[in-house]
Structure formats: structure tokens, C-alpha cells
């Protein structure tokens, strides 16, 4: 079986780097050298150009805004993107990584307003739209240089030279085209609707923008319950001595009361009345308790009216308005019936302000309130929504003119009290939507906007969503699927300045209506209207105000007086980012074949909230334009927070500058921390400020990999070995070599499975970066702490034997393959090792291909080798645990270990060669196997009652009785039987019980492998003099080796050793184990004294062994 097609004869050559790094800052230095190597040798460019153009892997790099610095969320997204792109490149694909910039929209405008000292649309218009937009254009890339520095330093490869910008003419023209296509498909319309409105930004928001970045947060509102006086008594409700009938209404927005035009009741609610001072108050029966509680608390005398009040007796009754601003409105101030009114909160009666509530608007429009033609949008909006762009009342609300609506609540309540209309006020804590740009509470207001009719294509979007592989998988039917099911039409227009303009021209005379929509600048397609064709002027900038100056006579006006003028709105910047797949290529004007052949994208990733942002807008436009999902695979990663679960912010000072972390520890450590965490597929990462978690990655991941390389180079240099990559597993005969080779192949396959295997039936969805990272960590743990440690004596051998060369070749081979397969996840450190080991296959590891193991099938004996080795590693861990708990030194030999097997043939029939490895590793002389496990442990059975209740709920009492009487048995086939075979009994399924073992000896431990119980081991702790002396000899070897290291001796240096002690057991030990000690420590002489003149060892290095009253001296020869 061939691992590679050709035999690699590769000479190991050390390069200029120091191989003995100890601190994280050293790894940072290595990374900087590697970054320079990549740059000088154009490795990134070569990684693309070296791949076949016809074998592409497409991923979309979502455009960030460049008017702020990157944060940890950007870094996380970048790490995932770069890892997948590197992996697919090494899998043989061409992966273009074109970077993009989001240039338009509120972030740019808000920064410009702040720096220019202008605020609000009127101030901008006075300042000049041209000057304002030019400032936006020049400032939008303010931090692009810093972005490039961050991205480069995180070892992320992107193409900045061919980047796209949403403000580029080509990008904007593709957006025009897409709008035109939607218009032609009947998916665009203009309408007045209630929309979430940011008065701080003076613009409406999309409905999904109120659902991202935790836009909902707690807000305390002042509520009021007030009385509206009916002008007539309710039908069939004539009560003696009643002077007035009043309807109680509860509202959390007192500021909307000046704009009240109707009241709404429900046909599904029972109403009742209560009399106070000869006035009857009407409200829902569900509110009665609240009413009575308030009256008692405030000593208000009341009388409950007998019987219910039917909603029909209230319908269409007129009432006296609280304010007189709209007294002239026809059809207003009536009680209307509506299904949306509920009695969960409030009085079961709702006040209607059609300019500030969706239900209010729809109901009043249906009833002709106000009686204004929908075509006269300006008059209608001025009537029902009398506030300016900044959220202040206009002159129509004369008592509160120029006051912000939120600032009028107290005054309005005071007026209600003065008119004796206020029944009750309260503070109300509730979740309220805020502007995700400014953190200010939103207003819901009526506005005229342009919409994509998403509801028309909603069902198709739901169908296409089934074709997308979401990671984590629950996003498909959960967060994203539910969002699609409730999708609403999308308001895509913004009455702002810096953005792609809506390509819509309308007649300025409603008597001669006409609408023109354009889909291109020049005439390219016969069926698409072009701007230059109609306006007969060359166009090189689509931005305002230049585009607003394009005016022409209305062709449908025979008088020739009316003109076609552009609507002043610009696109929602989410429409622009959602157009990125085709707009970055200037489709369909250029790159038509390229786009159509490779759409949809293979992969995309952003944080999970983009299910209601970018992922959603991509999906809407892709479905509407191409009837396809926009991507095939999508990772929704989580959020990086501080250790208290709070967002990272400058105000809280709860995070470190990423660049400082990179400078101290390198970016590979931060990358691997994030990739190996659940944050890489939807969880949240709680990141400490001090870099402890990053240091842990250095210690637990990067150093083990580096130490493997370092170990090889040290001894290969000494022996001047020309190591080679082993090409055939069959040529490996050493059991440890065979094991680590098989483990390497198994690890590579597990990484491939994690990254590529898609099998929904078994829960595999590919792109499992965390699982791939875990496989890498586990392998290098085994390589360092098992293979290298177990094989050190082979490398230390003074002779260049075949076995020694085989060990070198084995270590070299697994490093070769593991460096390759780890490269996407640890790009810099693997590159450093690749360069240092001089594999001479490719100039860079990132230009090489992933290991080819398609033709490798591990034989049964290979699989068994792995199984046996994992078993003894597990047993070693159990023995070490007992030694630690019982304070028995690892170097102290013990006489015997007894293993009691529990239904495990591997444990009972462990081959002798594995027994020998086990005994040597745990420092025990002999091993005994037994099957009577009950002699040393007792079983404890625990039933899983929820699972049993699903299958045999009627037998639960019987099962409990049998369990209490301890009537159960493990059958020969491994099944568990509760009861006795001759009588009542039940065979339990694996998930219906747990079987534990309780050991009876303090020197015993259960043996498990994964979830499976294998048996029990017992350690014999009896010590003889011979065992004690051997332990002392091993301790002496350890302190000699430590002294060599402390004094910076080379591993090949020969030494003299002098021991001074009066301990008889130590002297006997040295005598008995002399050859062992000198061989292990490269000692040419070893002398022991009871007393010693210090002058005789003045040139020696001194150390002590206190527990044996021993002083040791060594000298390099």
C-alpha cells in the first residue's frame, strides 16, 4: 500500500532559525519571518495561480466597513475564512480571495456628520450634498491601511489588489440591473407603511435590522390609562343616573395620543362596566381585578355593573377626542372592531394613531380614516404622522411643536390629569427595539418607501433553504428557517445621501403619471433601459447629486410641461451587500460565464446574527433573480465576549488589543484557540483580557508540535542522518513505528471526515473545524508523550543501526504528513517547520497538496495495533492516577499489576509485546489477568427511567422492585437482563441503564475506553529492597539529566559524575545499577564517596537529592 506515489529521499537541513524556542514571543518572531517569506516569494499569488482555473472553490468574503478598526469578531470570521480557503487550496482547488469594502450607508454618513459638524438631513442639504458625499467618498477608506495590517498579521491571505468597493461605478451598475430585474418580475412596489425609524439617523430601517446585534433591550416607559368619553350611551346599555360613559384605554406611548384618530375593541373579548361618581367606565372583564385594586389602593368608591357589555353595543360609537388637532378629520374618533386587540395586557381597548402603528394604519385605512387619497402621499403623511425627520412634532401639534416626541410624555399626562381623563399611570419595563447604529430607541412611523415583495417568493426561499448545508445544522429549520417563514416585504429605500441611488424616475405631475426604471448606464441589452440613451449625456458617477440632475420631459405629457425626476431615495446598504455575488464581477455586463458557471458559492461564513442580515439579503436577491440559494455551505459562528459574558467594548476596557496579542504570542495561537472552540460553529467564546487562553494554546498545541520537530533536528544533526519519507506501510516492522504511522493515517482521515464528509443521517455536516483541530491536538499528544518518549532510547543509541534509522524515518514521515494536514489550521508554525525540515517538495507547505490517502486501507492488524495501543495508553493513565493519589513515584518500580477483564477479549488476550510496553511504561515487573471481577469490585446498576418510560411505562413499578431486590444479570452476549430468566424479566436497551463499578481497593481503578467499561486493575504496592534500589537508580538518572539541562550541556556531551552520600541504600543501588546509570547519562565515570573534599570537585556542577541526603556533581568532558 503506497502512501505517496514516489519515494521521497529528503535530506534534513537546518536553516537559520533557532530551533529551541521556549516563550510565546519567539513564536511571534517566527511568524513575522514567515510573513516576510510569503511576501518576498509571492506564495499567496502562487497558491492561486498554481491551481486549475476550471477547478474552482468559490467563497464570498462579506464586505466590512473600513471606517472603524477590526475587532475580535472580524478576526474570528477571518480565521475561519482563511482556514477553509487554505484547506481547499491544498485540496487542489483554485480559491480566489477577493476582498471587498462596504462603502455606502449610515456608518459613512454618521462619521462624516460628526467630523464635519453637521447634523441631520436639512443641515446636510444646506452644507451641500456634493460636498458631503465627496467627504464620505474620501473618508470611507480611512482605516483600510490598518485593516490590511491586521489581516496580514493574522496570517490571512486576501487579494487586496483586486478588491471591490460598493461605491465603484461597476458595482453600482450591477445593483441598478438587479433592481430593474426585480421591477420587471413584479417584485418592486412603492407604498406607505409603518416602518421602524431611527430619528437619530433620520432614516427608516429594514424589519430585520431590528433583530440583529441585540437591537431589543430593556426600556422603562411611562404608561397611562386614560378615559375617552363617548358622545352617546352604548346601545342596549341605558343605566339610570349615569352622566357619562367612558372607555378606559392603556398605552405605553402617551406621546402618540395627540395623533389619536380611533379606538379599537375586539369581538373576542368580554367587556364590563364600573361606576364612579355617576360615570360608567368600560373595559375588558380581564382588567376588572386591576381596576378594583387601583380603586381600593386610592380609596375610590366604585360599583360594578351587572352583566357583560357586548362589543356590538360599542361599535361605531363616537367619542370626544382628547386633543383637538384633528377635529376636522372625517370618519375619525369612532370605536372600531378589530381582531388584533388582545386582553393579555391593558384594558382590552386600544387607541389608534395610524401614523405610528402598523395595525392602527391598516385598520384606519380600511375605515377611510383620514379621508385622503392614497396618491397624495405628502398630504396623507403630513396628516397622520406630524413629526419631522428628527422625531419632533410639527406645527400641526401646536402645543408641542419642535419637541421630541419622547420628551412630551410628562406634559401630555399632566394635560390628561387637568382634564380629569387620567385614571392611572405606571412605570413599564419592557423590551424595546433600538437603533443598532446609535443605540437610541426607535419610532414606528408611517413613511413612503420602495419594497421588494418578499412575501411573493417566501415559499420558494423556504424550499431553497433545504438545499443549504448549515453549520450548525439546527440553523436551517431554526433561526434561519423560522425567519423565512415569517418573512415580510423588505423596505429597500433610504431617504439619505451616500449610497447607490434608486434608478427610478417619476413624473412631477400626477395628472400625467409615468415611472421609468433603468437597468444600465450605457445601452448594452435591448430589453433593459439605459440612462445614457434616454438622457443623452455621458455618465461616470451615479452618486447624488449628479444623478439627481438627470431630468427630461415626460414623454406621456402632451403639454410638454411635466418632467421626469428621480426619486431622491438611495438603496439600503444591505441591498448592496446582498448583491455582492454578481456586483463584484460587474455581472451581467462582464464575467457573465464566470459568474453563471460558479454560482452559487461553495462556502460562506459570518456570525450567527447574519441569518437576519447578510445571509438573508443574499437569499432574497438570489431567489428572486436566479431561483437558486446563494451558497451551498454556511458556518454561523458565535460571538467573542469577555469572561463575564459582556460584549467587548472600549468603554468597559475588557479586551486586549489583538495586535498586542499577536506581538506577544503570534496569531496562530489566537487562530487555533478560536477554531478549536465551539465559537467556530455557533457558541460564544468568553475571552480573557490577559492572554491566558492564548498562552494555553502555545503550551498545549504549538509547543508540542514544535517540540516534535525540535527533537528530530537535535538528534538528526548529531547523527547526520538523511531521513526520508516512508512510502509503504508494509516496510515498517517496529511496533511503535507501525502504531504511530497508523495513528497518523487515522488522524488524517478524521480531519478529512471532519472537513468534508456530509452525511445528514449520522449528523455529519462537514466544515467541522473544531473536530479537525481536536484531531491535531490528540495526535501530537500521542506523538510527544507516547511515541517519542517511548522511543528516545532508539534515538540516543550511539550506533547508527537500522532500527535507529527507521525511527528517524518514521518521525520524519509523520511530521511530513501532519505538517501538511495541519497547515490550514496553523499556517505559520507549519510553514516554519516545513522550511526547516527542507522537505523539498514545494517551496511552501501551502503550495503542496493534502496527503493522498485515497488508496490506503488499514489492515485489520493495523486497526488492532491502534486499538491495543490506545488500550495500554489508557491503562497507563489509570496506573499513573493511582500513583499520584497514593504518592508512589513514577520511577519507583512495583512488583505486579492485576487486571480483571469485564467482557473484553482485547484486555484479556493482550499480546505479550503490548504487555511488555505496558509494564515498561508503568514501571511494573509483571502482569496477571483474571476474569472474576466480582472479587475486587461490585456492580452498581442505575436505570434511565425517562427512556424506559417511553418503551414500557406500564412496567415501571415492576422494574423498580426488581432493581431494589438486586435481581439483574449480564448475559453472555453482553445484554443486561433485569429479573430472572425463569420468571418475570426484561432485556434492557443500551440507553436504558448505566452500569458502574465500585472498586474495593484503594490501589484499584476501573478501566474505560470512551463510554465502555473494560475492567478493573489493581496495583501491588509492596516494596522490596531490590525494587527500592532500582527506584533510587532511576531517580539518580533523572537528577543527572536535569543537571545537564540546567547547565546547558549538549545532549551528546560526555560527563564525569561524583556522588557523595552516607546512605547505604543509595550506595548499594549505585553498585547494582552502575551500568544502567552511566549508559543513560553518557557518563564516562561514576564515583561514590561517603565524604568529599570540596576542592576536589571545584570544577563540577552541583545538585542535591534531599530525600536521600545525596549530593551529586557532574563535569563536562
Curated annotation (Swiss-Prot):
Q: InterPro entries recorded for this chain? A: aa-tRNA-synth_I_CS, aa-tRNA-synth_Ia, Anticodon_Ile_ABEc, Ile-tRNA-ligase, Ile-tRNA-ligase_type2, M/V/L/I-tRNA-synth_anticd-bd, Rossmann-like_a/b/a_fold, tRNAsynth_Ia_anticodon-bd
Q: Which GO terms describe its molecular function?
A: aminoacyl-tRNA deacylase activity; ATP binding; isoleucine-tRNA ligase activity; tRNA binding; zinc ion binding
The cross-references to Pfam families, in alphabetical order and at most eight, read: Anticodon_1 (PF08264), DUF5915 (PF19302), tRNA-synt_1 (PF00133)
* Transmembrane helix recorded as keyword: no
List the GO terms this entry assigns under cellular component, sorted alphabetically: cytoplasm
Residues forming the motif 'HIGH' region are 64-74
Q: Tell me the keywords, alphabetical order.
A: Aminoacyl-tRNA synthetase, ATP-binding, Cytoplasm, Ligase, Metal-binding, Nucleotide-binding, Protein biosynthesis, Zinc
- Which cofactors? Zn(2+)
Xref: Gene3D superfamilies: HUPs (3.40.50.620), Isoleucyl-tRNA Synthetase, Domain 1 (1.10.730.10)
Q: What is its main location?
A: cytoplasm
Q: Does the keyword Zinc apply?
A: yes
| CDD domains, per database record | Anticodon_Ia_Ile_ABEc, IleRS_core
Q: What is catalysed by this protein? A: tRNA(Ile) + L-isoleucine + ATP = L-isoleucyl-tRNA(Ile) + AMP + diphosphate
Question: What residues bind ATP, as annotated?
Answer: 650
| SUPFAM superfamilies from the UniProt entry | Anticodon-binding domain of a subclass of class I aminoacyl-tRNA synthetases, Nucleotidylyl transferase, ValRS/IleRS/LeuRS editing domain
The record's listing under PROSITE patterns reads: AA_TRNA_LIGASE_I
Report the enzyme's class at the first EC level. ligase
Task: Quote the EC number.
Answer: 6.1.1.5
**Record-level GO BP terms:** isoleucyl-tRNA aminoacylation
Give its localization. Answer: Cytoplasm
What does the UniProt record say this protein does? Catalyzes the attachment of isoleucine to tRNA(Ile). As IleRS can inadvertently accommodate and process structurally similar amino acids such as valine, to avoid such errors it has two additional distinct tRNA(Ile)-dependent editing activities. One activity is designated as 'pretransfer' editing and involves the hydrolysis of activated Val-AMP. The other activity is designated 'posttransfer' editing and involves deacylation of mischarged Val-tRNA(Ile).
Family, per entry: Belongs to the class-I aminoacyl-tRNA synthetase family. IleS type 2 subfamily.
Tell me the subunit arrangement.
Monomer.
Q: What is known of its domains?
A: IleRS has two distinct active sites: one for aminoacylation and one for editing. The misactivated valine is translocated from the active site to the editing site, which sterically excludes the correctly activated isoleucine. The single editing site contains two valyl binding pockets, one specific for each substrate (Val-AMP or Val-tRNA(Ile)).
Protein name per the record: Isoleucine--tRNA ligase
Organism whose genome encodes this protein: Ehrlichia ruminantium (strain Welgevonden)
Corresponding gene?
ileS
Amino acid at each position: 500500500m503506497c502512501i505517496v506515489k514516489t519515494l521521497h529521499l529528503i535530506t534534513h537541513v537546518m536553516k537559520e532559525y533557532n530551533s529551541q524556542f521556549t516563550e510565546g514571543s519567539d513564536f511571534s518572531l517566527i511568524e513575522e519571518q514567515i510573513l516576510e517569506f510569503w511576501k518576498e516569494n509571492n506564495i499567496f499569488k502562487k497558491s492561486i495561480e498554481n491551481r486549475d482555473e476550471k477547478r474552482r472553490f468559490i467563497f464570498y468574503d462579506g464586505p466590512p466597513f473600513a471606517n472603524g478598526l477590526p475587532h475580535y469578531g472580524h478576526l474570528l470570521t477571518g480565521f475561519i475564512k482563511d482556514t477553509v480557503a487554505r484547506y481547499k487550496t491544498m485540496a487542489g482547488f483554485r480559491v480566489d480571495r477577493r476582498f471587498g469594502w462596504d462603502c455606502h450607508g449610515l456608518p459613512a454618513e454618521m462619521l462624516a456628520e460628526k467630523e464635519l459638524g453637521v447634523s441631520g438631513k436639512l443641515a446636510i442639504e444646506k452644507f451641500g450634498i456634493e460636498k458631503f458625499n465627496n467627504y464620505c467618498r474620501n473618508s470611507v477608506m480611512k482605516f483600510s491601511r490598518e485593516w490590511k495590517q491586521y489581516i496580514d498579521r493574522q496570517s490571512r491571505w486576501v487579494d487586496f489588489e483586486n478588491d471591490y468597493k460598493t461605491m465603484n461605478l461597476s458595482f453600482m451598475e450591477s445593483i441598478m440591473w438587479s433592481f430593474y430585474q426585480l421591477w420587471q418580475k413584479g417584485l418592486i412596489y412603492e407604498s406607505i407603511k409603518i416602518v421602524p425609524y431611527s430619528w437619530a439617523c433620520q432614516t427608516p430601517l429594514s424589519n430585520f435590522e431590528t433583530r440583529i446585534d441585540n437591537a431589543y433591550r430593556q426600556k422603562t416607559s411611562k404608561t397611562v390609562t386614560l378615559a375617552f368619553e363617548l358622545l352617546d350611551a352604548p346601545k342596549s346599555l341605558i343605566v339610570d343616573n349615569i352622566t357619562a360613559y367612558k372607555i378606559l384605554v392603556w398605552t405605553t406611548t402617551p406621546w402618540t395620543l395627540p395623533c389619536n384618530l380611533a379606538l379599537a375593541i375586539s369581538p373576542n373579548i368580554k367587556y364590563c362596566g364600573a361606576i364612579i361618581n355617576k360615570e360608567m367606565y368600560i373595559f375588558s372583564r380581564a382588567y376588572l381585578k386591576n381596576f378594583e385594586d387601583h380603586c381600593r389602593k386610592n380609596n375610590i368608591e366604585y360599583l360594578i355593573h351587572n352583566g357583560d357589555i357586548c362589543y356590538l353595543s360599542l361599535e361605531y360609537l363616537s367619542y370626544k377626542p382628547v386633543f383637538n388637532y384633528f377635529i376636522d378629520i372625517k370618519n375619525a374618533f369612532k370605536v372600531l372592531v378589530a381582531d388584533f386587540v388582545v386582553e393579555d395586557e391593558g384594558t382590552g381597548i386600544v387607541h389608534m394613531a395610524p401614523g405610528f402603528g402598523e395595525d392602527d394604519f391598516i385598520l384606519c385605512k380600511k375605515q377611510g380614516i383620514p379621508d385622503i387619497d392614497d396618491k397624495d402621499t405628502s398630504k396623507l403623511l403630513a396628516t397622520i404622522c406630524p413629526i419631522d425627520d428628527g422625531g419632533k412634532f410639527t406645527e400641526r401639534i401646536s402645543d408641542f411643536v419642535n419637541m421630541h416626541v419622547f420628551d412630551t410624555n410628562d406634559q401630555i399626562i399632566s394635560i390628561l390629569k387637568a382634564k380629569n381623563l387620567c385614571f392611572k399611570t405606571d412605570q413599564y419595563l419592557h423590551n424595546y427595539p433600538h437603533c443598532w447604529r446609535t443605540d437610541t430607541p426607535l419610532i414606528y412611523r408611517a413613511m413612503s418607501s420602495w419594497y421588494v415583495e418578499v412575501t411573493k417568493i417566501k415559499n420558494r426561499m423556504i424550499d431553497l433553504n433545504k438545499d443549504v448545508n448549515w453549520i450548525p445544522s439546527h440553523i436551517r429549520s431554526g433561526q434561519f428557517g423560522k425567519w423565512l417563514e415569517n418573512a415580510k416585504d423588505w423596505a429597500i429605500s433610504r431617504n439619505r445621501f451616500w449610497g447607490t441611488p434608486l434608478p427610478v424616475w417619476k413624473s412631477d405631475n400626477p395628472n400625467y403619471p409615468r415611472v421609468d426604471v433603468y437597468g444600465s448606464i450605457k445601452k448594452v441589452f435591448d430589453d433593459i433601459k439605459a440612462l445614457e440613451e434616454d438622457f443623452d449625456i455621458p455618465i461616470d458617477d451615479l452618486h447624488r447629486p449628479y444623478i439627481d440632475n438627470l431630468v427630461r420631459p415626460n414623454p406621456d405629457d402632451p403639454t410638454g410641461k411635466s418632467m421626469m425626476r428621480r426619486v431622491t431615495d438611495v438603496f439600503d446598504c444591505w441591498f448592496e451587500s446582498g448583491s455582492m455575488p454578481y456586483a463584484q464581477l460587474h455581472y451581467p455586463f462582464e464575467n457573465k460565464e464566470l459568474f453563471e458557471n460558479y454560482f452559487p458559492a461553495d462556502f460562506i461564513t459570518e456570525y450567527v446574527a447574519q441569518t437576519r442580515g447578510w445571509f438573508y439579503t443574499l437569499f432574497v436577491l438570489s431567489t428572486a433573480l436566479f431561483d437558486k440559494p446563494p451558497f451551498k455551505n454556511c458556518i454561523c459562528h458565535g460571538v467573542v465576549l469577555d469572561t463575564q459574558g459582556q460584549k467587548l467594548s472600549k468603554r468597559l476596557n475588557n479586551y486586549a488589543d489583538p495586535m498586542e496579542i499577536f506581538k506577544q504570542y503570534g496569531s496562530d495561537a489566537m487562530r487555533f484557540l478560536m477554531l478549536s472552540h465551539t465559537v467556530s460553529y455557533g457558541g460564544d467564546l468568553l475571552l480573557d483580557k490577559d492572554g491566558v487562553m492564548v498562552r494555553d494554546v502555545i503550551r498545549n498545541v504549538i509547543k508540542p508540535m514544535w517540540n516534535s520537530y525540535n527533537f528530530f533536528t537535535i538528534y538528526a544533526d548529531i547523527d547526520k542522518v538523511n531521513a526520508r519519507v516512508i512510502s509503504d506501510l508494509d516496510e515498517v516492522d517496529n511496533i511503535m513505528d507501525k502504531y504511530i504511522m497508523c495513528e497518523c493515517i487515522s488522524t488524517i482521515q478524521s480531519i478529512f471526515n471532519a472537513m468534508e464528509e456530509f452525511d445528514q443521517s449520522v449528523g455529519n455536516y462537514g466544515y467541522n473545524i473544531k473536530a479537525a483541530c481536536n484531531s491535531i491536538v490528540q495526535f501530537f499528544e500521542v506523538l510527544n508523550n507516547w511515541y517519542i518518549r517511548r522511543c528516545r532510547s532508539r534515538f540516543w543509541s550511539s550506533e547508527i543501526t537500522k532500527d535507529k534509522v527507521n525511527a528517524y524515518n518514521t518521525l520524519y514521515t509523520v511530521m511530513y504528513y501532519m505538517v501538511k494536514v495541519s497547515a490550514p489550521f496553523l499556517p505559520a508554525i507549519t510553514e516554519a517547520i516545513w522550511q526547516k525540515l527542507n522537505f523539498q517538495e514545494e517551496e511552501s507547505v501551502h503550495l503542496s497538496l493534502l496527503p493522498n490517502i485515497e488508496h490506503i486501507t488499514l489492515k485489520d492488524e493495523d486497526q488492532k495495533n491502534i486499538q491495543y495501543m490506545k488500550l495500554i495508553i489508557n491503562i497507563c493513565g489509570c496506573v499513573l492516577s493511582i500513583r499520584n493519589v497514593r504518592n508512589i513515584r513514577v520511577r519507583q518500580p512495583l512488583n505486579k499489576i492485576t487486571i480483571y477483564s469485564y467482557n473484553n477479549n482485547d484486555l484479556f488476550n493482550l499480546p505479550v509485546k503490548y504487555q511488555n510496553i505496558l509494564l515498561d511504561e508503568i514501571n511494573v515487573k509483571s502482569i496477571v489477568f483474571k476474569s472474576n471481577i466480582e472479587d475486587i469490585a461490585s456492580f452498581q446498576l442505575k436505570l434511565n427511567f425517562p427512556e424506559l418510560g417511553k418503551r414500557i411505562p406500564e412496567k415501571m413499578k415492576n422494574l423498580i422492585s426488581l432493581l431494589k431486590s438486586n435481581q439483574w444479570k449480564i448475559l453472555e452476549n453482553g445484554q443486561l437482563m433485569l429479573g430472572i430468566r425463569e420468571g418475570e424479566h426484561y432485556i434492557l436497551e443500551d440507553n436504558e441503564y448505566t452500569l458502574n463499578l465500585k472498586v474495593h481497593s484503594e490501589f484499584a481503578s476501573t478501566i474505560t475506553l470512551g463510554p465502555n467499561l473494560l475492567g478493573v486493575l489493581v496495583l501491588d504496592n509492596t516494596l522490596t529492597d531490590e525494587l527500592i534500589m532500582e527506584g533510587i537508580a532511576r531517580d539518580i538518572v533523572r537528577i543527572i539529566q536535569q543537571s545537564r539541562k540546567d547547565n546547558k550541556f549538549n545532549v551528546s556531551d560526555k560527563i564525569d559524575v561524583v556522588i557523595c552520600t552516607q546512605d547505604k541504600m543509595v550506595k548499594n543501588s549505585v553498585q547494582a545499577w552502575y551500568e544502567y546509570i552511566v549508559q543513560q547519562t553518557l557518563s564516562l565515570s561514576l564515583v561514590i564517596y561517603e565524604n568529599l573534599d570540596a576542592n576536589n570537585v571545584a570544577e563540577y556542577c552541583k545538585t542535591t537529592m534531599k530525600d536521600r541526603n545525596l549530593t551529586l556533581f557532574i563535569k563536562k568532558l
